């Protein structure tokens, strides 16, 4: 069982002259820390480095009983990336509220990202009670992690844009690329693209007389 596996790891570490086979944490405590990490929150085992803008381990040699350090490290690396992406997108949303007076395309992108974060948080909170193993935690975060990673990818490019037109063009280009890479999220990403372009399209419609004039057009 798990204890026999742990004993074998200790024996092998001693035989190789290693000081430790890893510190064993309680399953429940460590699993909860992984869940918090995936959602972009610091915990007993993981913390956010504000200077580097990434999540890091508090201790490098923590594992759970029955699992070797190399095996658990692979999952931890994935979760560190998920948490870093989630924190980055959430910070962007908080810094660019949906009712901001800035660029309209940036505002609508922020609103779409906020809705996705809220939905994913609800899904993970609802399903986390059934995640009682490392494999289940990995499965729980696989698609949410990919989706938040896609948003972070779009965000990296959007932050370099200076106008609504540049933002819209960037989002559509990124969405087309990401939909080829992750076919399952196509409908979600296209919805994001539509949300980003909608204010600009309404402005164009008003400009050509297809709908009532907007305050923005009247001011001009």
Regions found by a protein language model. Name each.
Residues 1-220:
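Soluble, amphipathic alpha-helical scaffold/repeat regions
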